[in-house]
Amino acid sequence: MDTLKNTSQGLGTPERRTEAVRQPSLRRANFEDYEQIAALQIRNGLASTCYQAWAALWIDNPAYHKWKADWPIGWVLQTGTDKVVGFLGNLPAEYQFRGHELRVSTPVSWVVDESYRSYSMLLLDRITRQKGVDLVILTTVGPKAEPGLKAFKFSKVPVGTWNESEFWITNYRGFSQSVLASESIPFSNVISYPISAILFCRDKLKQLFREVDRSTSDIETCSEFDSRFDQFWYSLAHQNPNILLARRTRETLAWHFRDAMLRHSACIVTASKGSDLTAYAVFQRQDKPEHGLKRVRLVDFQSLKGFEQMLLPFLSWIFRKCNDEGIDLLEIMGRWLARPDLPPVFAPYHRRLCSWSSYYRAINEELSEILKQSDIWAPSSFDGDASLW
């Protein structure tokens, strides 16, 4: 969904005003605020979306259905003339951990007009003080938001390297053209190889994917999340009671990837044993049209015990598909596959990001201590809102 999500833009592309202002009031947002919130986003340089798509973030969210009686959709800053000058959305998500259901908040669409930006922390403070929430997770943190999170004692997600990405070039000519067309040169670590032929020769010296035991003929694609995903989720949760996992039922997956599926920008690949799923991956098209870059990202991979090796055939399959279809780049944001329970994956290229994108804060002290242990984390780009739009 092309919606209003980029924290760094929302706080860094201001509406130009210089007059002194009075402190705005803080109140709970409601669906009737949509027009003012959309206007706020637009005047701060962000894209908008239709009311139906915006409201569906909550109305169609299975976790919101469960908790809507006491779950705010967010908070707004409002002037004495009832003008909305700030907003921070509050998306609910259900996680499982050690047999318990955790209520998790994902703050989204943080934006404040420049004249009122000194009051922006009121919104974050309210998020951290809401009742009945166990954990707050952010996964699209920009550089301008990071200092505020640190001030509110948010911690970096300890698994993954969330200020880096790793990638494979799948179309050398297209990739080289997009790098040269980019003013900001986001892939400056490979700019010394701007010519596609040189890049190709370099990669031919590397083994992009080691030999795997399973044939990619075992892989199937799905046009939707079918009933097998429910049984897969219950098996996955049962096998991993000590891992913090976002709920991945058929209903939740369908909601999360609904807009990507409608745009035909998500690809679901699966492996099965008989009629039962044993592993799946979701790849998502996330292009950068201003630079002419065509890009696919791995946003989620899950497997039952004993089927972790399916990661490699999945990557090999999508690599060839990208190559065949002229996609320039296959990327993994945050390097979250670097876990001892998964087979090693070696991408030939890496790039540095402008911030550490994934932070969390536990609301109670006991959970806060537990979450310091890296072995209970198994994050991916499914968490938070990184692949929601």
Predicted regions located by residue number:
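Active-site/acyl-donor-binding loops of N-acyltransferases
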Residues: D2-T18, A56-L57, D134-F200, D259-A260, ...
